[in-house]
């Protein structure tokens, strides 16, 4: 295994940019997976890793050693990095000592019939990742994200989603006027809004969630065929967008399961 200790190394420079710059990720269509769980999930779902990097000394840990064996069996290129370089790339300490470079898939074809969720202008990486994870736990297969969302392939979103990226078709930088002619259910407090539990969910009804605080844009609300709200006790004003998404997605799931019986 090669050993790299210089920050001047071009691969290291590229990795640091990928870890910190959305522009570099979009330009190269690459990102960085950090930690044993994400790398194991990628391998389990036949996601191609281009290059794996191990922190000097971390190969003695059982989980890392097991992944090294799997990567070697697949002839994935591997390099050892000095602790200083590894930490500069990792950004968010995971204490697992392994990361991977990968090229993320480019999906273009919208397909609401497979189950789709639209995320509009949700900027917190943790919220985006949590919504992705909820989608992966349901029968939703596609997630569409507007340009105003946190970068779906950033290390922070990847970490929050806990491997959900490998189970979903993800379309990012979506313009609302480019969406296909689909029915959209969006959370709203407007006069037309129905209770979530009064909405009849079909598999091709797209669930949409707007930004933290501001909610769905006027443009999205105008497109919505099914504005809805989650009935609450009144003791709190609103729910976190990831919590609201989980409630709505699994009400959809409940109805689809009931209709299939």
Name each model-derived stretch:
Residues 100, 134-138, 149-166, 218-261:
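Structured adenosyl-cofactor binding patch, chiefly the S-adenosyl-L-methionine
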């Amino acid at each position: 295994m090669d050993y790299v200790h210089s920050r001047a190394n071009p691969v290291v420079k590229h990795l640091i940019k990928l870890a910190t710059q959305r522009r570099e990720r979009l330009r190269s269509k690459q990102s960085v997976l950090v930690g044993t769980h994400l790398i194991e999930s990628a391998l389990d779902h036949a996601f191609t890793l281009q290059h794996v990097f191990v922190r000097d000394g971390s190969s003695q840990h059982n989980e890392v050693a097991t992944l090294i064996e799997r990567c070697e069996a697949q002839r994935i290129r591997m390099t050892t990095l000095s602790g200083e370089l590894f930490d500069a790339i990792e950004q968010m300490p995971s204490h697992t000592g392994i990361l991977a470079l990968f090229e993320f898939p480019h999906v273009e074809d919208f397909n609401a019939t497979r189950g789709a969720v639209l995320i509009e202008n949700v900027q917190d990486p943790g919220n985006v990742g949590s919504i992705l994870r909820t989608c992966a736990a349901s029968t939703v297969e596609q997630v569409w994200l507007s340009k105003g969302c946190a970068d779906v392939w950033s290390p922070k979103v990847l970490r929050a989603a806990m491997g959900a990226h490998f189970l979903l078709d993800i379309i990012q930088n979506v313009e609302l006027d480019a969406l296909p002619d689909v029915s959209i259910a969006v959370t709203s407090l407007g006069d037309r809004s129905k209770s979530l539990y009064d909405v009849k969910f079909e598999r091709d009804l797209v669930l949409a969630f707007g930004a933290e605080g501001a909610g769905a844009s006027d443009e999205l609300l105008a497109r919505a065929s099914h504005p809805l709200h989650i009935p609450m006790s009144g003791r709190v004003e609103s729910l976190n967008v990831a919590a609201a998404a989980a409630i709505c997605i699994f009400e959809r799931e409940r109805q689809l399961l009931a209709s299939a019986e």
